[in-house]
Amino acid sequence: MKRRLILSAIVFLAGWAAALAQLHFWALKAESRPSENPTPADIAVVLGNSVNRKGAPNPCLRSRVEAGAALYRQGLAGGLLMSGGTDGDGSNEAEAMRDMAVSMGVPADKIRIEPRSESTYENIAFSAPLLHDAEQIILVSDAFHLARAEWLAKRHWPDKTVRLHASGSCGDSTPNYLRKLSREILAWLKTAALHR
């Protein structure tokens, strides 16, 4: 019985390690995608993240907004759609992202907001009605998050062409990065089971 328990634990840990390695590989692949002769998109959808982290502005959210704003300023996105709901402290992700983008030089009239979503599935589903006039879309998020976001987008936006753009590093420590990858594994399991 004890031997079977140990073997089960080893198999579980090996599977978990393999899943972490796969997510890290996808993240590296997303970060290194070539951007030679990029085609402009109609809009970039920037996926939300909590506004504050440990009482301070979240650098990971800012990194996503910076990536979206850069796409707009470079003429690679005709506008931005900020997608994110209200955090536990009452901060709304989409509104905070819009304000950040405006401070980075993106005109307010080039920014749409989807302020209700509380998950990646909802980011994609709730953004769909706001994308009725867009055919070419760039999804912006952390590199490790993009594979799942793309999987969901292809199911909810079948008539759209979706490309991916990884935001820059937000200074995560290795333990924090591994925690995020572990959380992403659980999110993939939920997505696979529920298609959400």
Where do the model's predicted regions map?
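N-terminal type II signal-anchor transmembrane helix
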Residues: 1-36
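A transmembrane-helix-recognition feature enriched in membrane-embedded lipid enzymes
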Residues: 174-196
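Intrinsically disordered, low-complexity sequence elements enriched in Ser/Thr/Gly/Pro
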Residues: 1-2, 62, 181, 188
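A structural signal for short, hydrophobic/glycine-enriched beta-strand patches
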Residues: 23-181
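Structural signature of transmembrane alpha-helix termini at the membrane-water interface
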Residues: 18-25, 69, 189-196
